[in-house]
Amino acid sequence: MDKHGIIESLLYTAGDEGLDEKQLLEILEINQAKLSELISSYTSSGLIIQKFGSTYILTSKKEASPYIEQLIEQKSNMKLSQAAMETLSIIAYNQPLSRSDIELIRGINSDGAVRTLIARGLIEAKDVENSRSHALQTTDLFLNVFGIEKIEDLPTTEEDEEEMDDFFSNLVNQKGDTK
């Protein structure tokens, strides 16, 4: 693989955070002049390498904006079902939980909702030590999507009712843009 392909792969893997120039120089074992030359000669049909300060980021070209906006709009129309929202709330406040625990709380089979939440990356199944079962818990993506740093930041019944209403309003209006 040539250096362009390696840079592209590294920046793709780094995602929105990009990579610091020093990291690229170190990994590629090249000097700054060679890196600048590689970046300026990089060509791709839909991607571009941009520099922000000392950080390089792989991003889409401006010409792709209308298509990307259309994709985002389509994804924003994919809301979570009421069952998925209920299941997510139960898991968030009571984690870790087994599927049977969720069904006891909801009073109905929740397999479909659990599958949806796992597919969206909002929850994950972890192996329970010394057992063949799994426990469901929220993911870091859940925290990111709902704008909280840690699970303890969820509003509690002791907190202001308006804050809880706002949180659950945001939860219910969650567009499902989790990929």
Curated annotation (Swiss-Prot):
<dbReference type="GO" id="GO:0051301">
    <property type="term" value="P:cell division"/>
</dbReference>
<keyword id="KW-0159">Chromosome partition</keyword>
<keyword id="KW-0963">Cytoplasm</keyword>
<keyword id="KW-0132">Cell division</keyword>
<dbReference type="GO" id="GO:0005737">
    <property type="term" value="C:cytoplasm"/>
</dbReference>
<dbReference type="GO" id="GO:0006260">
    <property type="term" value="P:DNA replication"/>
</dbReference>
<dbReference type="GO" id="GO:0051304">
    <property type="term" value="P:chromosome separation"/>
</dbReference>
<protein>
    <recommendedName>
        <fullName>Segregation and condensation protein B</fullName>
    </recommendedName>
</protein>
<comment type="similarity">
    <text>Belongs to the ScpB family.</text>
</comment>
<dbReference type="InterPro" id="IPR036390">
    <property type="entry name" value="WH_DNA-bd_sf"/>
</dbReference>
<comment type="subunit">
    <text>Homodimer. Homodimerization may be required to stabilize the binding of ScpA to the Smc head domains. Component of a cohesin-like complex composed of ScpA, ScpB and the Smc homodimer, in which ScpA and ScpB bind to the head domain of Smc. The presence of the three proteins is required for the association of the complex with DNA.</text>
</comment>
<keyword id="KW-0131">Cell cycle</keyword>
<dbReference type="InterPro" id="IPR036388">
    <property type="entry name" value="WH-like_DNA-bd_sf"/>
</dbReference>
<dbReference type="InterPro" id="IPR005234">
    <property type="entry name" value="ScpB_csome_segregation"/>
</dbReference>
<comment type="function">
    <text>Participates in chromosomal partition during cell division. May act via the formation of a condensin-like complex containing Smc and ScpA that pull DNA away from mid-cell into both cell halves.</text>
</comment>
<dbReference type="Pfam" id="PF04079">
    <property type="entry name" value="SMC_ScpB"/>
</dbReference>
